[in-house]
């Protein structure tokens, strides 16, 4: 075979898990056309499991939904690759809800095409994948539930992206995804490269389901009627691009001075198109801790709140459960759009970076005093307690100068950076090695707390809204840090040192090249930047009678700003228009306490 033929042959590899004997692949047309069917059925849900799913160029795969089923779930152990055409067929029509679930990622190449009634692709964690795909005694996917309603509930969560996602998982699209209904892509990073096309406007697939070279059909599908099967479920016309990552894969990095990174990213490159007959939601979320899938952070009565109240409460309680361990962490959430996105309803672009280190200490042993930051120190001959935390948090939405975002109804850009650092260190309350020698060894409690939190929205391209246009950026910075040197029955010098360098910024930059296109008197325009900070730091020493003395030192530096730069106007008059920038310091408390002497330095910029 010539090298090109060998490469093409290697590129195509679809292998069924040997335990899934109900999945059948039948090939024809010189081994370029492949029909896939399954007998693994749970009510309206059918499933396949593959060790490999690589569709080569010029290869066409027709995936058949069994009679009376609406959902076809495909579990793939390795990275999914589509360089040919994949059709989901319900009867003789393109239709049904097609799912791809893998822990390793997915790529749709430049020649890749997926046609379905709806498509959901999720890149899960290894543990979640094993749970979802494992076979039960009934030869059904255990994670999809043994009852149909349980399976449907799990699939709904997949469509919403409310499943554990692999922090290293990536979905890349260079080709086309065509659907008549919902499209969901969920991973830690979503890349729509130049030439990518996502559309759920399709009703006629006759020019999409076959592989052609010019006007000639190279590989023909089994489709006899290419009209898509429409579904009437709520939100069926929505497109969700969800990138989410957490610190579950980074480890606690104890003893390390190397900062690790948690990154979520959505990219829509120049030359990429997203078109929806419903809503479009581009969402990026990155956080310190584990994403709260089970919503354990939500208080009782949450479901009775209004939508606006729920959003406010979610902002307050956060989306990630902190374990108090990730002290050196860079959390980054980013959405970059240089292509075209159009929505027949609402278009929402949301970026959230959440870096919360809560109740973190040197020893993680809290005193039963009711005080948040008092903790036990180390019980060693050398009574020292040193704590170092460095948190960087950044949320960015960037709309490039050739980007075009259009919504027939509301259009919103919302960026949020949320940094919360609760940290304390203390020498041991009782020195278990209290000897005449150790009485002369100084006790030292030292804490260094660094936090850099920023939220930014940059707009250089076109924004068109049929109703409301909203551009918001918010940065929340909350720090409580304490260093305490207090050892009973010790004459040793007690020293407490606290150094905190803190920065919080919120910026909106609308450049002169930007077009803010609104319909006259149809809606409101809001451009709002908010920076909120609350800082409490305390360095304290408690010395005993007859001690050699003590020193408490506190250096706290806080630098915050909030800016809106608007270098263009609106194309028409709005019902209401507001442009605001707020910088609010809710609390700034800096203390250095010592019964013998104290030294405190503060710097506020």
Task: Mark where each language-model region is.
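Low-complexity, glycine- and small/polar-enriched segments
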Residues: 3-605
